[in-house]
From Swiss-Prot:
InterPro entries: GAF-like_dom_sf (IPR029016), HrcA (IPR002571), HrcA_C (IPR021153), WH-like_DNA-bd_sf (IPR036388), WH_DNA-bd_sf (IPR036390), WHTH_transcript_rep_HrcA_IDD (IPR023120). One of its GO terms (biological process) is negative regulation of DNA-templated transcription. It comes from the Bacteria. It comes from Chlorobium phaeobacteroides (strain BS1). NCBIfam families: hrcA. The lineage of its organism: Bacteria, Pseudomonadati, Chlorobiota, Chlorobiia, Chlorobiales. The gene is hrcA. This is Heat-inducible transcription repressor HrcA. Keywords: Repressor, Stress response, Transcription, Transcription regulation. Belongs to the HrcA family. GO terms for molecular function: DNA binding.
Amino acid sequence: MMFHDLSERERQVLSIIIQAYVMNASPVGSRYIARNYNLGLSDATIRNVMADLEDAGYISQPHTSAGRVPTDKGYRYYVDLIMRVQGIDDEEINRIDRNFRLLKYDPKDSADILQAAAKVLGSISQQLSVVISPRLSNALFERLDLVVLSSSRIMVVLSIQSLFVRTIVMELSLEVSRQQIDNVIDLLNQRLSGLTLREIRNSISRRLADCDKDRELLNMIVGSADNLFDDTPVLERLYIAGAEHIVNQPEFDQPQKVRDLVCMIEDKNRMVELLEKEGRVKPVTSSGMDVSISIGRENSATTAEDFTVVTTPYYVGNTIGRLGVLGPKRMDYERVVRLVNYMADRLSHSLS
């Protein structure tokens, strides 16, 4: 998106229009600006500045109002060239801490932690919050255990990167003793521990080729490697919260907007696509982290054209997850960026 240079006066007026529209959800007129902001400009002068901003595509006039509202281009200019993001303050941190304390979750269970983070971010931001767990292809395999369920079934339990546990039930086509199971567990842990799941998928046959003992059971494990050591399915990686908050915003007075939101929430693959697509990056000076912001038609999904998506990565060892919020373009960008950035930092520490 190309911008032409705005004068300081134009930048001031654009910034005020965006801030006032975010606060009041009503189109902003020149008289409102003249009365409420000490710019030292007359109503007529402000009106001329607004006309120039409209001609340049930064604001537009709804059919039913004399005021103006920001366009996608206006929001983008504001986010890229005007907005300054400060670090999160103690009051906000205390609110987040209180929200976490009110939730009942297991601090040792990664799925519980991610769901709790989504709930807190949704509640604090009043937007739809989404947390995506890391893809596990680059996660380190730590340990495998086999649990006998019956004479013909075993449960394979994988411990990954200290935090993630995967369980898969396998049908046995042969009888095995406890000693055979223990032998296979020891061998697999010895040969595979410390490798990434991708490395295991690509090399497990070769790594176990010289093992003749308990070969039938080993062959079953090797034959199931693509499922055992695969990435977590999308549906299991996605944690969504905050729908009850976002629908209270004025934008959702229109039933079609609610339907669009529901469609997005139900399409898990599209939701992951929205969050994992890198938008324009906004550096957050206070933390050194980058927050990605996609506004309106910058989003890949047509149902997301009236929304902004703000996301950032979080880190678990050498794996990367992503969290963020989805809300109307009329959002408090500085605050949302601060919250998303802080929650990612907190999540990285909680899962490390």
